[in-house]
Amino acid sequence: MRIFKLMTLISFGIIQAQEIDSLLYSKLYEKGEWKSFYQLNKNNEFDFVQINSRIDSMYFIHQHNVEKSVLKHLFKPILGLSNQNQVEGQLIAIKSAYPFINDGSFISFAKYDKNRIAAVIDFNPVFKSQIGGLLGASKGKDGDWITTGEIDVHLENPRKKGSVMDLKWKQPDAFTRKLYFSLETPFLFSLPFGTLFQLDQNFIEKNYHIESFSGLLVGLSHFGQWRFGGKKESGKDLSINERFNSESVLIGLKTDKRNNRWLPHSGQFFETVLTLGKFNDYLGKTTMFESKFKFQKYKDIGNSVILIYSKGERIFLNSRKLNLAKKVKFGGINTVRGYNEDQFASEWIFIQTFEWLFGDLDQSQSFIFIDIPAVSDYTIHPGYGLGFRQYKGTIALDISIGFSKRDAGGKIHIKFSSGL
């Protein structure tokens, strides 16, 4: 009987010790500590003994997609961090600034030389290089069909440098042509920031032409990717044969926390750009201010998802009325569906979009939408309708049919892209 009682007490003590050990381990795990520990004091209480141990090196797995020097700059912000929670927070910021570092990439940790900590980075990027286009068709008042088009080339990681190139050509109608080119490099030589160059041209026959060039520095912050630089713009109002130009300072922020690069259905996206400078025309110089923003957020509702998408843009010239060249253009698949591409122009615009997504959301999405615009000069009725998106392998397709109170008959918007 005494042996039985002794065995019971020993078993109870072992179980209690295991529970305490598990509790203390979970506390260390919550703190993200690598080398700290709990120590029993003379009062039979556990004291937390913190030992600072910072990450001093990185080791990459699956690094063949990007040059190692680029990877070291991408993940350099985690060096010197002292616990796992700090690293995970920094990794979220890195992913939001460079979305090709998706959830398939993760970090583990290794101890070596007794007191040193290395970050082991399993790098599995998803680069989204593609060529795409846009096709729109609608029936005009004279009964003839009007066709519009766009070509979009997007390249990521050429030459394994982690850079991004965009080339867009657009013809909203028979008289209008647009060209946009940008090149972004994540890091300039060995500096902790990169560069972004943008060229934008816009021409409407017998009306105006306008061209702008931007040069920016880009870098990483806790909120995403920051941007800072300058912009030069020049143009001519062909209707009155008057030239204009401007020089300005530009700042911006971009963060992308969406879950899927082709068909996102969770997370959020935010981008904003502010421009302040001097505008010069035949009346003289004046102050210019421009602002743009985009915000997307996905919310689960049962087996479906609601996309909330807000978009706004404003251009302000002190003591000036905006000519057509400077006004914000909108209408069509990228702004207000149910209308022709760039059918309208205004000094400022705010568009609130709601989409109800359902289906196998990673591969195909059926949706019902409404685009609600608010503009400075007049009233634009909302566009509404339904559509379908699909991604298979390397082919992505976006089709929507939009309606509006203003125009009789619907507008068909088709957008496609193919991976490269």
Give residue spans per PLM region.
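Outer-membrane beta-barrel proteins
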Residues: 202-207, 279-287
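Gram-negative/organellar outer-membrane beta-barrel architecture
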Residues: 80-271, 298, 304, 328-332, ...
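Detector for outer-membrane/organellar transmembrane beta-barrel domains
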Residues: 290, 294-320, 336-370
